[in-house]
């Protein structure tokens, strides 16, 4: 599912909301999660999961085309850990359509 599909599904389930308003809400939520992560904060959505940032150490990588070794700088990467309720629902097939 892509963001536009998510927006459409939410709008379909909430006919009292305009599509453009749902899109603004979804964008605002994603922006706030991104801002929190960029500050190094953890974002927890109970029953769904938690977003956090992990640091990857600098390392020596390899160019897959040439095989040459290349230095890869230290970087921050987003990390998502599913919540217990989400895992249970997925394992029960609850979300299958």
UniProtKB/Swiss-Prot annotation:
Looking at the keywords, is Ion transport present?
no
GO BP annotations listed = DNA recombination; regulation of DNA-templated transcription; regulation of translation
Question: Gene3D superfamilies annotated for this entry?
Answer: IHF-like DNA-binding proteins
GO cellular component terms attached to this protein's record: chromosome; cytosol
Q: Per the record, a Pfam family? A: Bac_DNA_binding
Q: Which domain of life is it from?
A: Bacteria
**What are the GO MF terms of this UniProt record?**
DNA binding; structural constituent of chromatin
Look up keyword DNA-binding and say if it applies: yes
Q: PROSITE patterns, from UniProt? A: HISTONE_LIKE (PS00045)
Keywords in alphabetical order: DNA recombination, DNA-binding, Transcription, Transcription regulation, Translation regulation
Q: What role does this protein play?
A: This protein is one of the two subunits of integration host factor, a specific DNA-binding protein that functions in genetic recombination as well as in transcriptional and translational control.
What quaternary arrangement does the UniProt entry report? Heterodimer of an alpha and a beta chain.
Record family assignment: Belongs to the bacterial histone-like protein family.
Q: Which HAMAP family match?
A: IHF_beta
PANTHER family in alphabetical order:
DNA-BINDING PROTEIN HU, INTEGRATION HOST FACTOR SUBUNIT BETA
Which NCBIfam families does this entry report, sorted A to Z?
Answer: hip, PRK00199.1
**Name of the protein described by the UniProt record:** Integration host factor subunit beta
Upper classification of the source organism reads: Bacteria, Pseudomonadati, Pseudomonadota, Alphaproteobacteria, Hyphomicrobiales
> Corresponding gene?
ihfB
